[in-house]
């Protein structure tokens, strides 16, 4: 009998846990639950004898993998997987997967919550502006980016996108204007929404030079990863350009410095993009099915390491 650990410092909803357990019960697996843990030692102990693991934002590094002597697969319930040490997973012969698309609508809806809040001057009682007819640039046209484009059309916005790995014809087929570079996207957009993963290529790539291309009154919204922002350069630019706004659901390392730009900066207390009941259930159950598919049939469709 396979043993599966659900390790979530930030727990799934009860409905999601019930659904995950039902998938594993049907497969004849044992399910172990570790929620709201406060010490890494608790995780190290829990992984010692499991065959598979589901995580959310929990970090799986070499130390965790060393402790997981029987682990064959770890699935991140969500799209981003920078919390898994992929090289270490490969070295330990552990398959790492994500569940792309399961949180996409949830994140996309939050983008517009943040944008309406910013456009209405953070609800301070003064007159704001509408989203209608504004130019929205989407950086990365994956599952979240496509949902953002879909919702933007409901606001009657002009939608542009750039994705180095998505053909222009795919973007255009979705009724979105494809541009040739990130620089062009910033130059041609009133608002840019970030949906790039945190990789060696993208870390700190959102820098002063790029953001400064936004026109007067530009807004940068980040529901991707904080690591893609060059915080020092963005802080300097916000000080220089009083017309820019930055809204995010990922608290920056330099949050106290950003907070000085009252009326132009907002962050949620915690990452909120996937924090809906629907996304919670979708991602968790998808992760469970992927584990069963891998252990029973060797399916590696969403594997992110080599």
Regions found by a protein language model. Give the residues of each.
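Glycine-rich NAD(P)-binding loop of Rossmann-like domains
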Residues: 118-154, 175
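Oxidoreductase and adenylate-handling cofactor-binding alpha/beta cores
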Residues: 108-124, 153-157, 286-299
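Rossmann-like adenosine-cofactor binding region
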Residues: 62-65, 166-260
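C-terminal helix-to-coil terminal segments
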Residues: 3, 8, 15-18, 23-26, ...
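Phosphate/diphosphate ligand-binding glycine-rich loop within oxidoreductases
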Residues: 51-128
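NAD(P)-binding Rossmann-fold cofactor-contacting core
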Residues: 154-172
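Phosphate-coordination loops involved in phosphoryl transfer and adenosine-cofactor binding
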Residues: 1, 71, 132-135, 208, ...
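N-terminal glycine-/charge-rich "phosphate-binding" loop or analogous flexible N-terminal tail
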Residues: 1-50, 158-160
